[in-house]
Amino acid sequence: MDIQTTGILVAGGGIGGLAAALALSLRGTDVQLIEQATAFTEVGAGIQIGPNVTRILRDWGLEAGLRRVASFPHELVARDARSGRELGNLPLGARAVRLYGAPYACIHRADLHQLLLEAVQAQGVSLRLNQRLVEVLALGDEVTVRTEQGL
């Protein structure tokens, strides 16, 4: 199967699904994404993303957007919950960039989701909401899916 010419269906519009759809579309693959929710809504809390992920986001052209919505801590400090005594720290900031080629970032899940959503839309990925997947049939190189809504 040549993913350059074969259409790909991504089931699920969370961070992982959007990231997969974006990565595939940037390679020239025709991508369709289905999501069971009727709308993308703000869900979740803050997440931390390491340099490997921020490097990928940069490679996907999302660095400017990431810089607008994320924070980039200079260090992480672990403290004893009762006494507040510092147990250890991990220098980040410029050190992370020097060692790993990209920064460590903290971002709200909804902001990362929105960044990826806007990127897949700009790539022309077909988004179909309100599509609950109920069956997947794999026969050889072909996969057929069925949703409750008849897709």
How would you label these PLM feature ranges?
Residues 38-58:
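Conserved N-terminal glycine-rich FAD pyrophosphate-binding loop of Rossmann-like flavoproteins
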Residues 2-8, 25, 52-151:
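Conserved N-terminal helical subregion
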Residues 25-45:
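Glycine-rich FAD pyrophosphate-binding loop
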Residues 17-18:
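N-terminal Rossmann-fold NAD(P) dinucleotide-binding loop
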Residues 11-12:
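Conserved N-terminal Rossmann-fold NAD(P)-binding element of oxidoreductases
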